Structures are given as structure tokens and as C-alpha cells.
């Protein structure tokens, strides 16, 4: 009679152990997180097999013979590494290995024209210099949300075969067609329900940026009549290769996909990469996927143009901070879209892109605070979801204290909305009539409403106005100083980013809750300014195909239009807002002198940041090591087109910058140094440079001294080298923080 009891007890114990085992397995699985394992450059050995090596490492670390559910992605064409699902302890083991540079989480990053090119002087005219043969051999890689291949902006009509150097493919997925303009397409987004595996653009963002950089010239383009004109890229004859890393279903752009896109784009032999993507915060280079990809691209002669981000106007918000990336801020152009609100007692001017025409008819006005029976005054004033009473807003124009929730007013039956914002240089698109007002104008509307029993207003269709003051830096983009490398100025340059009309994807709505579909749309952000600079860089490369990425970047920076802190309320951070100034494509063709920094210069720069010999060898892929002199070298002495130093607040300072210029102007040239700006005492030695031949190099030092800026302040000057024909301008910035 005891045997059944023993058996029952034994079974119970086994069952309990299985439960614990499964629970433990579930916990282990839940504890796994996707990480990027960065291993530097690909070894030069002919017998090296990256995928086999990655598999072997994972098997050793995890103790599992089958790693199919662990390995996410390999990087094997342009640099070395992989993405994998790891526990915290496995991550730590990998990070300690001699062959590994860094291990960091697979994070999600964010996506960050008919008149802008004319505004910059690069006009559609026979007088505009173009080298179309070389331009047609230029390939711009676009790492973004894909592309709408049927757009006229990407038509292959009139194009010959792809350049012979092209090593890429077109893997665009189902119903995706390539041509001799759109020569390559790849996608790295995960398979999600409702979003086919394809390089097709379901966000509109990638089509917009690609056409801004290199779209064909397409006439009679507008957004419902706004911004009517010819939409074109900076280099219409150039080819486009698309690398899709963002999808609406992913809610961002994954780190592993971005690195895979760089891995392929470099090996595919693109000339320039534009990537309007970034994080909210800056990261060390070895944990920043864009900085990692950009370093290996730079080493192969490819310029990376990256958006500064849209987290401004607060200081220290720029996330694109590596010196081997060209970081772009945003400005306006001389064109603006204005949505007028006509009140019973006058007019006020708002700012948005309103394509809806209410024929000037006036409708009753109601304030969100007065249109709620379920929320407090603050939430109702913001028109927060669930607060508005449809009976109180239906058929009326609703005032909302925030631009975040006009869709809520529409959902409750409002005819239009007037919203308050502290930024009117962001012309957003809405799915019904909306006008955006600054505080003073918004208060004018409120005062009018309080002065009459039956307030009414009309929200008019947007008008296009020209000749506004421009270029002025935008409010929204991220500012310096550089929080990782304080002595490198970021952003580098400013370009048009506000209210840009460019190609769009009919597979995506132009705004949230929008049922309309368009082929061209208006968008705003450093995402839009970034491809402008990529287009300018490609334009320069068509005249100077052998120039290195740093030479092209230097030419653009040192010939930029000067900007200053007095032209806009958002310019108060001066060079930390606009960098070297506003891009000037035509002048950049002939810069006279350039500051060049190649791979070895950047390795020396990393030596000064105390990178280990092991990591330097892995990153460089060669036997690079640091000399004692390089170890002591200051980051400010990288041969960069701008000069920046962080000093102690309110204390006398003296800083020295060492630079070398290369003559790309004319032989037998003599350049004299001139310093503009009285807030710094600057000495240049030598103050005269005589260059007998092209590509001759000359070195000099710049010593800046002074009493010391207050905390959170900067002082600046401009160094200008000139031979009477060329004016090579570099900002000198000295600042103090807390």
C-alpha cells in the first residue's frame, strides 16, 4: 500500500522540478536582450570567415550548439561584428574578449523642395555650372524609411546603365521596381503584420530625403497648391541607392539595421551617405551605430552627412558628434506658408500648412476650457484626449493651448482649430484646418472672445509669402556644445530644413489621422536639411572626384555664409546653433584651401582620447598604435575646419590650435591671415602662407586668449585666410560650462 504513495510523491517532485526548470528557462529567455557586438574592421586575412567566427564565439559564450534563435544579424562586408540575443552575464563575457571593441544594446533611433536650392544659389539654369558626366557616376546612399519607386523624382528615363564601380543589388521585395536612377534597394526592417517586407516607403520620410538630395527635376509640383514650382535634388543626374531601416510598425529605426545598412552601403561603393536619423542623447563613439558606420565609411573615402537632431533649442542636445561625420543644423528659406485667422475685429497671422479652403466663412469660436465637462481646466485647455464634449465643439473652431491635440477637436466634430505654440517656424500639416499662433497672437484671440458674446472667426487656406528674413536658424534643432568631445564644434553647418517641398509616398498619410494621399508634401526638420548638404557634397564631388570626405566637408564649411547671434531669437547659442554658417554651394566649388584629416589623423585623435592599443588595432584593422606624442595630443588639434576649446569659467585662458591647410586653389598663391571679432585676442603664426604648388601643405598655430567667458557662455572670432580671390573662414569658439 505504500508504493502508490511513493510513486505519487516521486511524480510530484519531478513535476515540481519541471515547473521550476521551465520557469527558469522562461526567465532566462525574458532576460535576454538584443546587443550589438562590435569587433572593429574586418581582418585582412584571406582565410577569415566572419560568419563562422561569429557563430563560434556565440556557441562558446552561450554553451549552445544551435544559435539560430540567438544570432540576429552579421556584419561581414565592410566591418566586423554581429547582433545577438544575450543575457547580461553573456554580454559581460563578450565585452571582456580581446577581439571585441564594445557591446551595447540594440536601441531604437528616430527619423529626425521647390525653392530651397534656388535660395542657396544652385539654380535650375544653364548658367549654373554642372559636370553632369561625373555627377551621373555619383551614387548617394540613403539610409532611411525606404522610397516610393514610382515617383517621377526617381524615374530612370534618360539615364544610362549604373556606374561600373557599383557593387550593389536591388532587393526591394515584392512589387518593387528599380531603374537606372534608383539603382539599389535593400531593407533591414523586421517582418511585421500589415507591413510587407519591402524597401517601399510607408512613412514618406525616405522619399522626401532622397528626392531632396538627388531627385529628378519635376515641374508643377505643390502640396495642394502650396509651394508650387519645380521639385529637384541638388544633383538630379546622380544615382540613388536606398537602405531601409525604419518602418512605422517598428516605431523607430533599430541599431542592428542601421549598422547592416552601413555594412552594405560601404561595400556597394556609394560615394556619399545621407542619414537623417539619430538618438535623443550623444553616446561614446564605440556605442554609437552611426559613428561606427561612419568611421568605416570615412576610411573607404565615403562622406557621411547626418542630421543634428530636433531636440532644440536647448544647449548640449546635439547627438551627432563624431568629427568624421558632417553634422547639419536647419534654417528657413525666404519662403513661408502663413495661415491667417480672421476675427470679428481684425486679423492675426498664424503658421501651419493648411490646404483646406473654408471659403472665408466664419464659424463660432469656443475655448477648450469651456468645452469640457469631464476634465480639469488645464487638460481641457490643451484639448487632451477624452476631454472635449462633442456637443460643445461640433461645427465650431476650437482654441487649444497646445499644438499636440488638434486631431482630438476634429474627432469631436470641430470645423477647425487654432492652437498655441512657442514655435512658429515649424509648419506642421494637419488633417483638417488648423492655424498655429504665438503667445501674443493667441492671447489676442482670447481677448477678442472675452469681449463679445458670440465670437466668430475664419481660418483661411495657407498663403505662400516670399522675402521673409533668411537664412535664420530654426528653433527646433539640437544645439551644441558637444558633450562627448567638448573641443569639437557641432553642428558643423546649416542648411534649409523648414517647410521643404519634396517627393512623398502615397503609401503614407501626410499627417496623423489623415486620409489623404499625396506624391509631394511639405516637411520640416534637420531630416530635411541633411540631404541638402548631401546634395551639395555630391555636387562638389562632381568637380573634384578625388577629394577625400574631409576635403569636401572643409570646402563647404570654410565657404559658408556667415551667420551671427543677432539675426534670430534662436541664434543666442551662436556657433553652437549654426556651426560654421549657412551652406553656399557655388562658392564651395573653389575654396582655395582645405583642412584635410584622413584615417590616420582620426586614429591619432582617438589616441588622444586614451583608446586602448587593442581597440585601436581592432577599429583600424591594421597595426595602428599610439606614440607618446599622440597620447598627449589634445582633441582640439585634430585638423578640423573649426576651432573650439572648453575653458574654466571666468578665468584667464590661453589655448593653442594647430592646423594644416592644403592648397587646392592656384599655384604661387600667398594667403594672409585676418581675424574678425573683438571678443578674443587671437595670434596666428605664421600670419602669411606662401604656397608654390597645388596640393602643397602649410602648417600654422592659432593662439586664442582672454579673460574667460562666464559659465554657460561663449566668445568667438573668425579666422579668414585670403589671397584676394578666396576667403577661407574658420570659426574660433571658446566657451565655459558649469
Swiss-Prot record:
Propeptide feature ranges: 26-112
Active site (record annotation): 144, 205, 527
Gene3D superfamilies, alphabetized: 2.60.40.2310, 3.50.30.30, Peptidase S8 propeptide/proteinase inhibitor I9, Peptidase S8/S53 domain
Residue stretches making up the PA domain: 362-433
Record CDD domains: PA_subtilisin_like, Peptidases_S8_3
Compartments, as annotated in UniProt: Secreted
Record note on modification: The C-terminal propeptide is autocleaved.
Keyword Glycoprotein appears in the UniProt entry: yes
One GO location term (cellular component): extracellular region
PANTHER family: PROPROTEIN CONVERTASE SUBTILISIN/KEXIN (PTHR10795)
Protein name per Swiss-Prot or TrEMBL: Subtilisin-like protease SBT4.5
Organism: Arabidopsis thaliana (Mouse-ear cress)
